[in-house]
Design a protein with these regions (language model features):
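Small-residue-enriched alpha-helical segments and adjacent helix-cap loops
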Residues: 6-143, 154, 158, 162-165, ...
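Membrane-embedded hairpin module used as a gating/binding unit in multi-pass transport
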Residues: 170-174
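A structural-propensity feature for long, helix-poor, extended segments
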Residues: 147-149
Length: 174
């Protein structure tokens, strides 16, 4: 996206996580291809600023080769915030994996449409900007909830992917 100081490249780390090596790579790429300035967005993304149009293909290749950007476009476009401290074997992590795996089947969504996955006992993302929240309710059931709604739809891990797709199709048709 073009900004006043050149292109702006938005990086959406998969599972809202970066390794220290990836963070160092982003800093290096920001200096190499951009103006050295980065921003952190409200949706847990990083933005590298000041890129020249001619440097964009090299930057994208470097991001993909280092595992920071996904070579699979639908997965890379997914706006997903995963609660901090979510462990890789947890329900929240598996729900995030299900969303990444289903990304090709998603209907056309607005560019800022996003998910917040907050399945722990503490709500870390209650104020995070998103359209669909995935949570565990007080009885321990998996819940899909439209942002701003008190009530949600109870689902299971087995039905999660199909229930999310149904919710997304409802969203775009309404």
């Amino acid at each position: 996206m073009m900004s006043g100081d050149g292109l702006l490249v938005r990086i959406k780390p998969a599972f809202s996580r970066l390794t220290s090596r990836q963070a160092q790579m982003i800093a290096l790429l920001s200096k190499r291809h951009g103006n050295g300035f980065m921003d952190i967005t409200n949706r847990a993304n990083l933005q590298i600023r000041g890129l020249k149009q001619s440097d964009y293909p090299l930057m994208l290749k470097d991001l993909q080769d280092s595992g920071i950007a996904d070579k699979h476009e639908a997965r890379d476009r997914l706006n997903l915030i995963l609660a901090p401290f979510t462990e890789s074997q947890s329900v929240g992590w598996r729900c995030a994996e299900a969303l990444y795996n289903a990304a090709d089947a998603f209907p056309a969504l607005p560019s800022k449409f996003g998910f917040a996955i907050d399945c722990g006992t503490t709500r870390y993302l209650q104020h995070a900007s998103c359209d669909i929240r995935v949570e565990i309710d007080e009885t321990g059931q998996l819940l899909i909830r439209l942002d701003g709604c008190e009530q949600g739809y109870v689902t299971s891990e087995e039905k999660f992917q199909s229930d999310i797709l149904q919710a997304l199709h409802w969203f775009v048709s309404s």
